[in-house]
Amino acid sequence: MRVGVVVFPGSNCDRDALHAVERAGAEPVELWHADADLKGSDAVILPGGFSYGDYLRPGAIARFARVMGPLEAFAREGGPVLGVCNGFQVLCEAHLLPGALLQNRGLRFVCRRVRVRVERADTPWTAACAPGEELTLPVAHNEGNYFADPATLARLEEEGRVVLRYLENPNGSANDIAGVCSEGRNVVGLMPHPERASDPLLGSGEGLGILRSVLAGAKV
């Protein structure tokens, strides 16, 4: 399986994501922001960082990058897409996921490990996890405070589209939401960084299950 990792100007987690994809057993494919196609990728990751310097607001400019055209078509056809941190923000700006990521409660950058609970194991990106499984994953963000209007939040809960939930909310996210998925469940956005917890040598391998999920999860 080929897993593409999109590189925007200002991305800084793309190398981590490419390395983690390889460790998960897939073939990593680097996708440049100006690419006109996805190079035959079977799944795509939008990594963390500060795309285009986070000017205007995080993800607002990246949403218009050339590669986003084929990526949006891929997602709407059911292709597995994962947005991590800034990638989650880009997916919200592209309207592939509902809601928005606001500045953290407390107005400070949060950089630490957090405990999250897997709420849904029926997405391509959580198929190797168990419902209710608890993971410790790193977060590193200034705008990770998930927000949606009350009707959207109610719909996400009713439709089972909250994928990860914080056990100790680090940023003020509504309903302790750490990740959500699209109606088709193929597009997932997470604020925690599974790729930074993919090698026990670096402190944790707990995020590797999320990246390995797509190998089996592509069939979900």
UniProtKB/Swiss-Prot annotation:
Residue ranges annotated for the Glutamine amidotransferase type-1 domain, each copy included: 2-220
Domain of life: Bacteria
Residues annotated as catalytic: C85 (nucleophile), H193, E195
Catalytic activity from the UniProt record: N(2)-formyl-N(1)-(5-phospho-beta-D-ribosyl)glycinamide + L-glutamine + ATP + H2O = 2-formamido-N(1)-(5-O-phospho-beta-D-ribosyl)acetamidine + L-glutamate + ADP + phosphate + H(+); L-glutamine + H2O = L-glutamate + NH4(+)
GO cellular component assignments: cytoplasm
Biological processes per GO annotation: 'de novo' IMP biosynthetic process
SMART domains reported for this sequence: GATase_5
Subcellular location: Cytoplasm
EC number, as in UniProt: 6.3.5.3, 3.5.1.2
One Pfam family here: GATase_5
NCBIfam families attached to this UniProt entry: FGAM_synth_I, PRK03619.1
Subunit-structure text: Part of the FGAM synthase complex composed of 1 PurL, 1 PurQ and 2 PurS subunits.
Its biological purpose: Part of the phosphoribosylformylglycinamidine synthase complex involved in the purines biosynthetic pathway. Catalyzes the ATP-dependent conversion of formylglycinamide ribonucleotide (FGAR) and glutamine to yield formylglycinamidine ribonucleotide (FGAM) and glutamate. The FGAM synthase complex is composed of three subunits. PurQ produces an ammonia molecule by converting glutamine to glutamate. PurL transfers the ammonia molecule to FGAR to form FGAM in an ATP-dependent manner.
Protein name according to UniProt: Phosphoribosylformylglycinamidine synthase subunit PurQ
Organism of provenance: Rubrobacter xylanophilus (strain DSM 9941 / JCM 11954 / NBRC 16129 / PRD-1)
